[in-house]
Amino acid sequence: MAKVREVYQSFTDSTTKTLIQDEAYRNIRPIMEKHKLANPYAQTVEAANDLEGFGIATNPYSIELHTHAAAKTIENKLLEVLGSILPQEPVTFMFLKPRKLNYMRRNPRIKDIFHNVAIEPRDVARYPKETIIDKLTEITTETAYISDTLHFLDPSYIVETFQNCPKLQTLYATLVLPVEAAFKMESTHPNIYSLKYFGDGFQYIPGNHGGGAYHHEFAHLQWLKVGKIKWRDPKDSFLGHLNYTTEQVEMHTVTVQLQESFAANHLYCIRRGDLLTPEVRTFGQPDRYVIPPQIFLPKVHNCKKPILKKTMMQLFLYVRTVKVAKNCDIFAKVRQLIKSSDLDKYSAVELVYLVSYMEFLADLQATTCFSDTLSGGLLTKTLAPVRAWIQEKKMQLFGLEDYAKLVKAVDFHPVDFSFKVETWDFRFHPLQAWKAFRPREVSDVEEMESLFSDGDLLDCFTRMPAYAVNAEEDLATIRKTPEMDVGQEVKEPAGDRNQYSNPAETFLNKLHRKHSREVKHQAVKKAKRLAEIQESMRAEGEAEPNETSGGMGAIPSNAELPGTSDARQELTLPTTKPVPARWEDASFTDSSVEEEQVRLLGEEAVKTATQQVIEGLPWKHWIPQLNAVGFKALLIQRDRSGTMIMPITEMVSGLEKEDFPEGTPKELARELLVMNRSPATIPLDLLRARDYGSDVKNKRIGAITKTQATSWGEYLTGKIESLTERKVATCVIHGAGGSGKSHAIQKALREIGKGSDITVVLPTNELRLDWSKKVPNTEPYMFKTYEKALIGGTGSIVIFDDYSKLPPGYIEALVCFYSKIKLIILTGDSRQSVYHETAEDASIRHLGPATEYFSKYCRYYLNATHRNKKDLANMLGVYSERTGVTEISMSAEFLEGIPTLVPSDEKRKLYMGTGRNDTFTYAGCQGLTKPKVQIVLDHNTQVCSANVMYTALSRATDRIHFVNTSANSSAFWEKLDSTPYLKTFLSVVREQALREYEPAEAEPIQEPEPQTHMCVENEESVLEEYKEELLEKFDREIHSESHGHSNCVQTEDTTIQLFSHQQAKDETLLWATIDARLKTSNQEANFREFLSKKDIGDVLFLNYQKAMGLPKERIPFSQEVWEACAHEVQSKYLSKSKCNLINGTVRQSPDFDENKIMVFLKSQWVTKVEKLGLPKIKPGQTIAAFYQQTVMLFGTMARYMRWFRQAFQPKEVFINCETTPEDMSVWALNNWNFSRPSLANDYTAFDQSQDGAMLQFEVLKAKHHCIPEEIIQAYIDIKTNAQIFLGTLSIMRLTGEGPTFDANTECNIAYTHTKFDIPAGTAQVYAGDDSALDCVPEVKHSFHRLEDKLLLKSKPVITQQKKGSWPEFCGWLITPKGVMKDPIKLHVSLKLAEAKGELKKCQDSYEIDLSYAYDHKDSLHDLFDEKQCQAHTLTCRTLIKSGRGTVSLPRLRNFL
């Protein structure tokens, strides 16, 4: 399985993984459905693991609760097993609820018999009344079953049952008997049940739920051994039990065999007859236990508790390996090996016995006292057996030697859950012989007292349904409320009617008068506007008297069309009181005669003016069609070049107007006729249909269709290829985005409602949801995505919305596949983007878009929009009547809460990975309408087609915001000015502190940890395993032809040889390091890489921005903070010693090239545990020396951004910069979640892998902080043109460049959040290339597309956050007690210092590091495993013996 898992883990392609997951899910579903019957419950993780060991799966998403779910699951599983072996004929069930037959999957038509005896009061509620009998009667079936009862009975019950029921042949029975109770052990399955012992009995407690507990006598455990039961059947009752002959007795035998066993639940098969059964009966034993031999007197002082054999062997080897095994050391070792959570399972007396026993073993000699057979001559060898016999007899008389004592003392007795079966013969004993094994005699009723303890008394009562109660409450409420007749009119009070005023009538009169005034005012405005239009048209007509308007057959030139003059001319009306125009929604008019005359005169004037305008328009014949889709079309509009925009274009003549097919809803036909969209019967291109069908059959395209069976794909292609032609009535509707193509169809569908044979096919699920929302009163299955429609079928009328986004050939294939389709309606835009197939081997990739084929059947193109305002629509060449100004803005910042449009699907997935779920591609946003959108511009934008750009630009109704995420490179080739010496670029103004130190509040005094004692360990126990594999010096050293071997393995001390000593003067190591760590390039290639990684840089920055809580808008530049950071950097530099400043003179000189870098090899001892004693020395690390002013400038920049980062970063993010271990401990205790696995992250070649993508990220980050542009350009220049003696370096991180730590940390954060989908509130700690998270987040799906474009590769390490497995961060372990140094790493480093003789110099530092763990004392047993405890103990002893005799952090603080 490990090899298979390794192969599966090697798959990195996300598509392959998706296919594997889909296939696995299809296999999982029937399996989970099968196990759901027995295990429908929500289980704990530990219980689920135990159940899986029994072959019982658990659904991790189940939420059904039970007090003892695991135990109940096993009970159900045994019933399921029983159901599979029971015959399909009537069976007698005893002590069983009838509803449990469901778990057996038993046919309810079988007339099974139920015999239930009410032993306890609650049995009345447990069993249905019709199944309860006064006493057990004769069993009339061949097979019977006793449920969870047999363990309370003795074999005499079996004898009586088979004796009184001659027809009975097979009896099945389930028992609940924990095998470990025979040894008085704790439960071997504590997650399923627990045990408690009381005198001569014990309690079985399922799931620690006392309500379901059983009480057993130890005598019940005899059932575990029963193999056969025999008895006699006297023919004459006069003979009694003693006086009989063979002829007078008939022999009977039943055979008992274990059928199945899960934990404490067992299924027995008891068969009439003397049959074969295994001599040994074995029960499941998860762990191996032993009991020490009973060697002490009195017997009570021996250790009788079964102990894990592993623990016993660890203790034995410990006491035999240490020099002196003191009593306290053995106790400490026992404390170390036993988990704190398991201590309550041991009594103090048992531990004393165990330690005493181990101390006894430690004092005995392990050297044999017997002679060997190899020494001596012939005579000696001949007499050797005699001597051995004499020595053996001597020890029997005078006592054993130490060696013989040790051999007998370590002869552990295994605890074996295997028993030899026994035969119970009642032929010569009374039937009550079983009770001889019981500690006392118990009546039959007492035996059955705890038989059924998990019943629910409420099961037998009928409860009133909730809806019935609510109905009664509603009825009571209605009765309390006086009824009101809806149709009853309000009567006026008696008396003078003139004095009565109806409030509703008064209100309506006021509303009527107000509305009339508003309508009249609107009519005046419209009349004036029509007069202006008429005047402008007349003016243009006079300018061109010889020209006439062109017909609708061709688009007229600019000279032929009327202009848009600004001339104003008042329209003279008969009265100053205009009336509502006919297109206004005026519900009320004044009833006076004067106002009626005004209304008639106003209508006449408006009609006349409107008709004059229409007569001058080139599209006057298309006005009804334009009005039908909501356009008045009375204005002339022009694009940017001055060309008039026609609202109707691409007219196709010659198409016959055919009748709609029979069965077409009249509402739909009416709307299409009004828009002049009559159907035309067209032939479909079968070649396109066959190409699509071939791709589907061969699973080259699609998502859902790939999951279909091969036979379905063959049926699809077969049906398409069988057709010679296919014609269908088609309505093609083309129009601009927002022109209302779908509006009329949706209106008709709302009128039609449910019950129609119409299917709407949509290209995306988002569009499907939009249609469902706009047409809510239809069946949900009317709207389908295109693959669902192909698989699930359609109606006889199919509407394809945005059909240009459907795969080429899909429409033809669907219509050919479903012959019942008689009418298709296509809505789309030939000017917008079309479907693009990415599969290179797909046949449809070479087909043209569907709009090319169907455009010749579209009667006209509606070039008008309701979506965009007039200014934007006209720039796009589209007619619009929306007034106002479209807001256009551009910056490098993203706006929040509005959709984001990006040029590529890859970019979309990456942005969605940052939490921007409303991200669409330019092409994929088709159908989207939003008030505001933001469009991301990058290097892919320029390669997008005009159709795609039109789609993106036409999405917004009010505002478009362009986001330019690339860096400005205009000043890239400019050089930095030469800088003066150190004294000239240092500022001498007064330094300002960034923030004042505020002393922390006094913490409450915590209760001190209890003292503990760690057991003594061998000095070499930690490093010995590394020394065993140590090679010779020159086998490990690096060798080069020019400089010979390196010199990293030094001295003859094997401890020192484990550690590689890297020195700056080692030429071989220097060149090996340069070859491994540095890569050369050239300035032009570096800059090309920088530009090519723009798309990745902005994704990294967006993830970083979200992770660190930076504001969405740019952070204004603060000169005050910049100067404070500069002074801080300067002060730190001047704090160096004078010698260091003098040594840096060369880098301070103006003659030092600002792009030049001096590279050195870092001198260090390599103390990483994973690099101890490596077979081959690894290359070292480089240090880069930059021009000093460059270091200080970019150091200031890094500190400036750090200042703002610390101000905004969330509390759950901790950056280990200028902090103390105490700070990290407090943070971890308040934020870290220790209840789940964690992830620690490291990288391979972190510095060298920070390429152009990381530089893009840094530039965007600097821009967000409003760093001056000249500083950003200087940083780009130094990163792309860094020169060493070998040439120009590739873009990478160099130690010593100024912002190394901050830049590494921020790149680490950006990469981690780009790769992982980290839940909100997750505790995270970062420092350079080290990081740790308190959860194991999932890898984002979008990261797989980005992974190959990043050089950076992470090395995640998952820890379980339990004893011995804690997340590591910068050499610190994050534990529930705070942070502490990794004891193994600390000990390894200490051993190096001790071997070099430098321990005295650094002892205080080691004591401080050790004290963070040492001060937790006894709690360390819960944190460290055995190996860590060994390292901790050895470190403590080394420091205590060589120092002041103790280790304590408070004491060290006082001392230092």
From Swiss-Prot:
Q: What is this protein called?
A: RNA replication protein
Please name the GO terms that the record assigns under molecular function. Answer: ATP binding; ATP hydrolysis activity; mRNA methyltransferase activity; RNA binding; RNA helicase activity; RNA-directed RNA polymerase activity
Q: Where is this region: Disordered?
A: 536-564
Q: Name one GO biological process term.
A: RNA processing
**Annotated (+)RNA virus helicase ATP-binding domain residues:** 695-862
TM ranges: none
E.C. number(s) listed in UniProt:
2.7.7.48, 3.6.4.13
Q: Does the keyword Hydrolase apply?
A: yes
Q: Does this entry carry the keyword Nucleotidyltransferase?
A: yes
Q: Where does ATP bind?
A: G735, A736, G737, G738, S739, G740, K741, S742
Q: Where is the RdRp catalytic domain?
A: 1236-1343
Enumerate the UniProt keywords alphabetically: ATP-binding, Helicase, Hydrolase, Multifunctional enzyme, Nucleotide-binding, Nucleotidyltransferase, RNA-directed RNA polymerase, Transferase, Viral RNA replication
Q: Matching SUPFAM superfamilies, A to Z?
A: DNA/RNA polymerases, P-loop containing nucleoside triphosphate hydrolases
What family does the entry list? Belongs to the potexvirus/carlavirus RNA replication protein family.
Domain (+)RNA virus helicase C-terminal, chain residue ranges per copy = 863-997
**What catalytic activity is recorded?**
RNA(n) + a ribonucleoside 5'-triphosphate = RNA(n+1) + diphosphate; ATP + H2O = ADP + phosphate + H(+)
Function, as annotated, reads: RNA replication. The central part of this protein possibly functions as an ATP-binding helicase.
Domain annotation Alphavirus-like MT: ranges: 59-224
